[in-house]
Amino acid sequence: MSMHKALTIAGSDSSGGAGIQADLKTFQEKNVYGMTALTVIVAMDPNNSWNHQVFPIDTDTIRAQLATITDGIGVDAMKTGMLPTVDIIELAAKTIKEKQLKNVVIDPVMVCKGANEVLYPEHAQALREQLAPLATVITPNLFEASQLSGMDELKTVDDMIEAAKKIHALGAQYVVITGGGKLKHEKAVDVLYDGETAEVLESEMIDTPYTHGAGCTFSAAVTAELAKGAEVKEAIYAAKEFITAAIKESFPLNQYVGPTKHSALRLNQQS
């Protein structure tokens, strides 16, 4: 029996909670073989309030990693995460088109959770023009959705729906805006738009500050489900269930950060 294979083109989070570390843990939980093309290394300074330090990988090295996977192995689905330069965004887009990669999940990472500053504000245009049109699914959070749609801060479900329609118009087939617990709402709310219908996905509101890597984990779960052959909406619903369980059992890693628990859903189902 062949193993389903998924690729993540993303950054390394040295703390293990986000980036390729979260992606690989999620792929493993979903019984999908994970492969990586590393774009950037993110470290945190424990002597400076966990300040993020960002070290991009050169494009030749990324290109070599991608050739290893696309030419030497093949993939059933793929996702992007942190792409720290316009050149890397363009390389990812070129690879998707030239290799005719399918089941493409774009997680348009623009900030590190816990950091107040936007990492790469000048790259929103490149994400809009280069990657959004190639997305089977694009999974922005509220801030990223505002940047991609050109709207102001998204404060309501109606705002999320409007932004999703604008992002879909860029060429993405399915848009999932992850609002989570950020809206003033009694439930954790995401919005799914397929070009015709806007669907509000509600789940239990979980009162926790420990959500490091939640966006990476959600998009990786969508990717894994697509790699296994799931229909797009079913992949999104399954990913929502997966991340809800992971957040519900999230935990503090130190005084600065707390990741989600990737094994939570599996362990719950076994008990």
From Swiss-Prot:
GO BP field: thiamine biosynthetic process
Keyword Metal-binding: yes
Catalysed conversion reaction: pyridoxal + ATP = pyridoxal 5'-phosphate + ADP + H(+)
Keywords: ATP-binding, Kinase, Magnesium, Metal-binding, Nucleotide-binding, Transferase
EC number in record: 2.7.1.35
Residues given in the record as Mg(2+) binding sites: 144
A GO molecular-function annotation: pyridoxal kinase activity
SUPFAM superfamilies assigned to the protein according to its UniProt record, in alphabetical order: Ribokinase-like
One Gene Ontology CC term in the entry: cytosol
A Pfam family assignment: Phos_pyr_kin
Keyword Kinase listed: yes
Binding site for ATP: 141, 178-182, 190, 206, 215, 240
PANTHER family xrefs: PHOSPHOMETHYLPYRIMIDINE KINASE (PTHR20858), PYRIDOXINE KINASE (PTHR20858:SF19)
Self-association and partners: Homodimer.
Function description: Phosphorylates B6 vitamers; functions in a salvage pathway. Uses pyridoxal, pyridoxine, and pyridoxamine as substrates. Can also use hydroxymethylpyrimidine (HMP) as substrate.
Annotated family: Belongs to the ThiD family.
Protein name according to UniProt: Pyridoxine kinase
Species of provenance: Bacillus subtilis (strain 168)
